[in-house]
Amino acid sequence: VFHGGVAGLKQQVEATVNLLTTDGRTPQKQLDDIRLHLHPQLKKQNTEFQEVLQPLLRQQGICILDYIELNQQQRNYLDNYFQEQIFPVLTPLAVDPSHPFPHISNLSLNLAVVVKNPDTEEEFFARVKVPQVLPRFLPLPPELRTEDNGKTANWSGIPLEQAIAHNLESLFPGMSIQEYHPFRITRDADLELEEDEAEDLLLAIEQELRKRGMGGTPVRLEIRSQTPESIRSRLLQDLGLTENDIYEVDGLLGLRDLMYFLLLPLPDLKDPPRQSVVPSRLQRLKEPCINPDVPEPEDGKDFFSVIREKDLLVHHPYQSFSGTVVRFITSAAHDPNVLAMKMTLYRTSGDSPIVNALIAAAENGKQVSVLVELKARFDEENNIYWA
């Protein structure tokens, strides 16, 4: 919502646009209502994680620790890991009159650091970006994992930013680390397009995508509630934000990174994968079937005979997409009686069987026309490639 909706509302407020919504709210009123409802939701979200989800994870042997909870052996291991794997990819940037505030990329995790020169007592502000090329959570080896009731944990480790924070002396040799505070910003990701004026829409979108890659206007600052006023005001000033744009998060920033734990080989903690079914009317067709679970008898009907007899309504994801829609497109691509294929693509994956079938249809001499929606939000680059 912040990438697009909130960013758009902020632009309307700055442009003094006071158009009312159907329920009579101005852009400013909508922003106020978003903040009013979102702050308690964020607080509840972090409370649920810390007081409910984390204890449940611990019961299952998944221990997300704080650095201060580690014993000396565990600290030594992670400190060595920092020196060998993390330190080489870090680039701390000081901010002073000769070094302007660095560009903060969208949704990147950062540390605001205050260091002091022990000789001059002068303090400096610096920013350390938590590298996105490394896992957000650093695991301990099995022999160092936390034990509970004599059982070794399935996973033990700490967030990456804590390993960095407790080794800041390596990044600022000769300086005294005064304080550090994590923060994250969200930038406007909407494309500013004047479609009526654009001679080439595809080229215009490509240009806007390059701008978005450099980063749109900041619209939100996420910090901890303990972040002091001096750091808050510094970040707000350099990012061009106001107090209303601050969202306090007491806990992990960027909870979506917890998806990391879904990759752990613990099948008992996961729902069994849902097996989509193929409608019975499509289970005995002549054409080769993409779904290997469907038999391919030679005496079956072809796809078009089935739908010619009666319309077929399918429900996804309960019924197989590959065994219905993909099979339909693939059948058409290879059917000599099909002369032309026309369809619209809004979002599709990089290895889409739909696209492969359309390419095969064109190679088979059929007339293929595809309308690709270039403005599918956050899929623009992918759709430009297919277009």
UniProtKB/Swiss-Prot annotation:
The entry's cellular-component GO terms read: polyphosphate kinase complex
Cofactors required: Mg(2+)
Q: What is its EC number?
A: 2.7.4.1
Gene3D superfamilies, A to Z? Endonuclease Chain A (3.30.870.10), Polyphosphate kinase middle domain (3.30.1840.10)
Modification after translation, per record: An intermediate of this reaction is the autophosphorylated ppk in which a phosphate is covalently linked to a histidine residue through a N-P bond.
Q: What is this enzyme's catalytic activity, as reactions?
A: [phosphate](n) + ATP = [phosphate](n+1) + ADP
Q: Give this protein's Gene Ontology molecular function annotations.
A: ATP binding; metal ion binding; polyphosphate kinase activity
| A GO BP annotation | polyphosphate biosynthetic process
Q: Which residues bind Mg(2+)?
A: R347, R377
* Any one Pfam family match given in the protein's UniProt record, by short name: PP_kinase_N
SUPFAM superfamilies per record: Phospholipase D/nuclease (SSF56024), PHP14-like (SSF143724), PPK N-terminal domain-like (SSF140356)
The UniProt keyword set, sorted, is: ATP-binding, Kinase, Magnesium, Metal-binding, Nucleotide-binding, Phosphoprotein, Transferase
By sequence similarity, the record places it as follows: Belongs to the polyphosphate kinase 1 (PPK1) family.
Q: What this chain does, per the record? A: Catalyzes the reversible transfer of the terminal phosphate of ATP to form a long-chain polyphosphate (polyP).
Q: What is this protein called?
A: Polyphosphate kinase
- What organism is the protein native to? Aphanizomenon baltica
Q: What is the lineage of its organism?
A: Bacteria, Bacillati, Cyanobacteriota, Cyanophyceae, Nostocales
